[in-house]
């Protein structure tokens, strides 16, 4: 499977970090959150980070070109409808994850892989919220502080 578009559910520290590195790697990214203020703060943080990386010579591409690959949205259907890969980075709350995975399963293409970033909840339980448990994986990211 060729991954071109990534949907990130949750624009907090982990989610916006995943969106940033995905865009740097050249993917189209849809960053979704349920809170407009958190979403806009995430975009501001990503922009700041990209500019710093560029200033330090760690990012050769124009930060605005990278940022243009990140599409912020409150709408889960918009975020996942063209996604090849979805990464959920929301609170460690099974009800929150149930809502995300149920909705993502409804709107994501049949070939899409759905990933959870959980560190404490059973992945098999999360997979059970979908009609495609075989396409649900666990993926733990690391949020660097420097």
Regions found by a protein language model. Name each.
Residues 113-146:
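Rossmann-fold dinucleotide-binding core
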Residues 37-41, 52-114, 120-122:
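Rossmann-like NAD(P)-binding element
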Residues 1-4, 65-68, 74, 81, ...:
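Structured loop/turn residues at beta-strand edges in well-structured enzyme cores
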Residues 26, 67-69, 111, 133-136:
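A generic structural signal for alpha->beta connector loops
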Residues 9, 32, 73, 89, ...:
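Structural motif
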Residues 1-49, 56, 107:
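NAD(P)+-binding Rossmann beta1-loop-alpha1 motif at the extreme N-terminus of oxidoreductases
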């Amino acid at each position: 499977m060729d991954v071109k578009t990534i949907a990130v559910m949750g624009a907090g520290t982990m989610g916006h970090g995943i969106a940033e590195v995905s865009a740097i790697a050249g993917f189209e990214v849809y960053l979704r959150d349920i809170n407009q203020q958190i979403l806009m703060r995430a975009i501001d943080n990503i922009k700041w980070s990209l500019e710093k990386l560029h200033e330090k010579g760690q990012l050769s591409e124009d930060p605005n070109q990278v940022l243009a690959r990140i599409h912020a949205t409150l709408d889960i259907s918009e975020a996942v409808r063209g996604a090849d890969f979805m990464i959920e980075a929301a609170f460690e709350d099974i009800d929150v994850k149930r809502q995300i995975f149920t909705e993502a399963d409804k709107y994501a293409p049949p070939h899409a892989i759905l990933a959870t970033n959980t560190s404490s909840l059973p992945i098999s339980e999360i997979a059970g919220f979908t009609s495609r448990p075989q396409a649900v994986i666990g993926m733990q990211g690391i949020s660097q502080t420097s």
